[in-house]
Swiss-Prot record:
This is Zinc finger and SCAN domain-containing protein 29. The modification Phosphoserine is found at S153, S561. Residues 508-517 have a biased composition (Polar residues). GO terms for molecular function: DNA-binding transcription factor activity, RNA polymerase II-specific; RNA polymerase II cis-regulatory region sequence-specific DNA binding; sequence-specific double-stranded DNA binding; zinc ion binding. The lineage of its organism: Eukaryota, Metazoa, Chordata, Craniata, Vertebrata. Residues 528-545 have a biased composition (Acidic residues). InterPro entries: Myb_DNA-bind_4, SCAN_dom, SCAN_sf, Znf_C2H2_sf, Znf_C2H2_type. CDD domains: SCAN. Belongs to the krueppel C2H2-type zinc-finger protein family. It comes from Homo sapiens (Human).
């Protein structure tokens, strides 16, 4: 009998426990309870459910089965390579199949009564020399099992061979039950589950099909025609798996609880909490408030809330259930029977109405832009989504709608990057600059997001951009950089700042109010200008020199906030800053470039007469907004000053026929006149932008401003920090459209997608071999070049792979982390341990086969 203390030895890898789990014999323990307990502990040591996610555990199981079903001639060769995941194993087999010149032999197999000749690969010579031990062939049948049960198909696992009427309760040790997978939970509930392994669309079951003891009627499910569409367009209908696993935001959860507190939903769920029709109606009601959820997601979320509620009731800290009060009202049957005439009464009774209440009815509110919305003041909160503080409501306003914010659904990193890239396109940039609350335009943005696989409503897109603006202003006001992870993208998109040449009429225009604007309004505008946040341009304008005598003007900020237009001009005091040596160099270059502008510039058309700036234009009776009220003689001057506001780029760099704004042209000229003007004083490396130099300087200074609050690890770059955070949150925002597999990095998704397309963009020029991963390609290139960049600091020996260097370094340190569980012998390489384990496997095989 194996000692339990041996299971807790440190330094053993999961492969050892996997082999022990698979080769476990019932005869080694005293009875069934000990056998089950031993298998449980071995399985947990192998799969490590406390560390790995469900997807990772499933991948380990599938990888093991995949290696088992491989042809015997290549199985040992693949196992010799020690693939860490299924994707790597598939790639190894594909590379082996496509390797030219490999001899093949034909094999005749019978498929449905017909003989088919297949080609069988011959494995490498190295793999033929390995000892082939098929685990399945040596596994003995447990004693006490009837012959009828032994005669079952070997393809059936232990779960399939069990009586379907028997349900195995989760085995609990130390108070921690082993978590069920989502698939098992759905099967136990009797729901159909059809895995989408080949990327096909969701399969629909025929009417009246049987799933276990439950009969599924297709006519009970709402048809696609009856489902409400966001903008009455068919392409908004998505399959369930497209939105599965999306994080539930705070406002979205409160909306769900407010809906469930209504009488019809509360009574129905109290009688039958698994009623799919009720959850379907809840999902439809959520959709009315801008949250796209399936009935299964609503049911799963409510089950999760119930679980956290029970934890608090059993003595866990209150933080375990953030919605304890709302759940207390529902679970304790304290919800008063309310009329079902609207969600507002239920929400107000449950205390769920938050700071985001509006004065519009949901049925009256559409996606189309209303004229009154331009004049409305949309309160922008500086708090995050988890803020519980309520904003006082206007007592004279109409009955509030619960939870205006439809942007509560979490936006992933790649989704936000795609969203900002779409907004930076010319057609959206120009249109949103003129009217940032155009709902039809946000509908087009949402449609473009849909093309990239992200499902969003127009209102969610608008709310997200407002949130990005808020976090951007926080950083500009001096808060920590991690407040706005997309600061650089927002800085390039939001700010438009002009260093204009001296102009007599310009100062007068900046200081005097426009005709049609009262002195009180002008004073109010000046006060708003003093309070406005200082914005940067898209070309690192913090480094830009202001020529002597120039007047600083700032065009209205792109996509103004709903309160009104931002400050029109810079405060003089804000221009006094500490400037580094790099900034001084930038100043000199810009001053030099400005003197050379006439040689390179080509004056384009400048007769725009439609400026949307609320500071420069007045709204007079009988005239539309945007009509000029200044004297006609100053029209050309005003237009020349308003080109940045209009987004016009009248200056063309003749060398490349590329158009720019005034400041962008100066920056572009600097890039041609002086290549990479920002030089690192430590290593001499040069950069084209000061921001890139600042990031590079952190390598020398060791500065890591982005610190993880969970584990304390620090990072130099915000992008690496965001990627690291997903380790703690478990977020995997990048989903494969073919198989549904999720990843926490976009690069991992791109590499994975190449396994479906067969694309291998990295081709070796020496031998012609192709790779789907740049790292594998780089390692292969070193075979031809002889490059060995990884040097041992102790003996100076070089290696082409970092893994080889780590294994070599253990020869100096004496570290042997891989220990044999049977004899205690330790090894510095996992491959050596695997080969050593085959010796014990052979010994056990001989012992079992020896006559007694």
């Amino acid at each position: 009998m194996m000692a339990k203390s041996a299971l807790r030895e440190n330094g053993t890898n999961s492969e050892t426990f996997r082999q022990r789990f698979r080769r476990f014999h019932y005869q080694e323990v005293a009875g069934p309870r000990e056998a089950f307990s031993q298998l449980w502990e071995l399985c947990c040591r192998w799969l490590r459910p406390e560390v790995r996610t469900k997807e990772q555990i499933v991948e380990l199981l599938v990888l093991e089965q995949f290696l088992t079903v491989l042809p015997g001639e290549i199985q040992n060769w693949v196992q010799e390579q020690c693939p860490e995941n299924g994707e790597e194993a598939v790639t190894l087999v594909e590379d082996l199949e496509r390797e030219p010149g490999r001899p093949r032999s034909s094999v005749t197999v019978s498929v449905k009564g017909q003989e088919v000749r297949l080609e069988k690969m011959t494995p490498p010579k190295s793999s033929q020399e390995l000892l082939s031990v098929r685990q399945e062939s040596v596994e003995p049948q447990p004693r006490g099992v009837p012959k009828k049960e032994r005669a079952r198909s070997p393809d059936l696992g232990p779960q399939e061979q069990m009586n379907p009427k028997e349900k195995l309760k989760p085995f609990q040790r130390s108070g921690l039950p082993f978590p069920k997978s989502g698939v098992v939970s759905r099967l136990e509930q009797g729901e159909p589950w059809i895995p989408d392994l080949l990327g096909s669309k969701e399969k629909e079951l025929p009417s009246g099909s049987h799933i276990g003891d439950r009969r599924v009627h297709a006519d009970l499910l709402p048809s696609k025609k009856d489902r409400r569409s966001w903008v009455e367009q068919d392409h908004w209908s998505f399959e369930d798996e497209k939105v599965a696993g999306v994080h539930w935001g705070y406002e979205e959860t409160r909306t769900l609880l407010a809906i469930l507190s209504q009488t019809e939903f509360y009574e129905a769920l109290r009688n039958c909490h698994r009623n799919s029709q009720v959850y379907g109606a809840v999902a439809e009601r959520l959709r009315e408030y801008g949250f796209l959820r399936t009935l299964e997601q609503c049911r799963t979320k409510f089950k999760g809330l119930q679980k956290s509620y029970r934890k608090v009731k059993s003595g866990h800290p209150p933080e375990t259930c953030p919605f304890f009060e709302e759940m207390e009202a529902l679970m304790s049957a304290q919800v008063i029977a309310l009329p079902s005439n609207g969600l507002e009464a239920a929400a107000s009774h449950s205390g769920l109405v938050g700071s985001d209440a509006e004065t519009e009815e949901p049925g009256q509110r559409g996606w189309q832009h209303e004229e009154g919305a331009e004049e409305a003041v949309a309160q922008e909160s500086d708090s995050d989504d988890m803020d519980l503080e309520a904003t006082p409501q206007d007592p004279n306003s109409a009955a509030p709608v619960v939870f205006r914010s439809p942007g509560g659904v979490h936006w992933g990193y790649e989704e936000t990057k795609t969203y900002l890239a779409i907004l930076s396109e010319t057609q959206f940039y120009e249109a949103l600059r003129n009217c940032h609350r155009n709902s039809q335009l946000y509908g087009a943005v949402a449609e473009r997001l849909w093309e990239y696989g992200f499902l969003r409503t127009p209102e969610q897109c608008r709310t997200k951009f407002k949130s990005l603006q808020t976090s951007y202003r926080k950083v500009k006001n001096g808060q920590a950089p991690e407040t706005c992870p997309f600061f650089e993208e927002m800085d390039a998109l939001v700010s438009v700042r002009v260093a204009a040449p001296p102009n007599d009429g310009q100062e007068e225009t900046a200081s005097c109010p426009v005709q049609g604007t009262s002195e009180a309004e002008a004073q109010k505008q000046a006060e708003e200008a003093d309070e406005a946040t200082e914005e940067d341009s898209d070309d690192d304008e913090e480094d830009t020199e202001i020529p002597p005598g120039a007047v600083i003007t700032r065009a209205p900020v792109l996509f103004q906030s709903p309160r009104g237009f931002e400050a029109g001009f810079e405060n003089e005091d804000n221009s006094k800053r500490d400037i580094s040596e790099e900034v001084q160099l930038h100043r000199t270059l810009l001053a030099r470039s400005e003197r050379k502008i006439p040689r390179y510039l080509h004056q384009g058309k400048g007769n725009e007469s439609d400026c949307r700036s609320g500071r420069q234009w007045a709204k007079t009776s009988g005239e539309k907004r945007g009509k000029l009220t200044l004297p006609e003689k100053s029209l050309s001057e005003v237009l020349s000053q308003q080109r940045p506001c209009l987004g016009e780029r009248p200056y063309k760099y003749l060398k490349y026929s590329k158009s720019f704004g005034p400041n962008s042209l100066l920056m572009h000229q600097v890039s041609h006149q002086v290549e990479n003007p920002y030089k690192c004083a430590d290593c001499g490396k040069s950069f084209s932008r000061s921001a890139r130099l600042i990031r590079h300087r952190r390598i020398h200074t060791g500065e890591k401003p982005y610190k993880c609050l969970d584990c304390g690890k620090s990072f130099r770059d915000s992008s690496n920090f965001i990627t690291h955070r997903r380790i703690h949150t478990g977020e995997k925002p990048y989903q494969c459209g073919e198989c549904g597999k999720c990843f926490n990095q976009s690069s991992s998704l791109i590499i994975h997608q190449r396994t479906h397309t067969g694309e291998k963009p990295y081709q070796c020029e020496e031998c012609g071999k192709s790779f789907n991963n740049s790292s594998h390609f780089s390692a292969h290139r070193r075979i031809h070049t002889g490059e060995r960049p990884h040097v041992c600091p102790d003996c100076g020996k070089s290696f082409s792979k970092s893994s080889d260097l780590r294994a070599h370094h253990r020869t100096h340190t004496g570290e042997k982390p891989y220990g044999c569980h049977d004899c205690g012998k330790c090894f510095s390489k996992s491959s050596a341990l695997n080969k050593h384990g085959e010796i014990h496997a052979r010994e056990k095989l001989l012992t079992q086969s020896a006559p007694k």
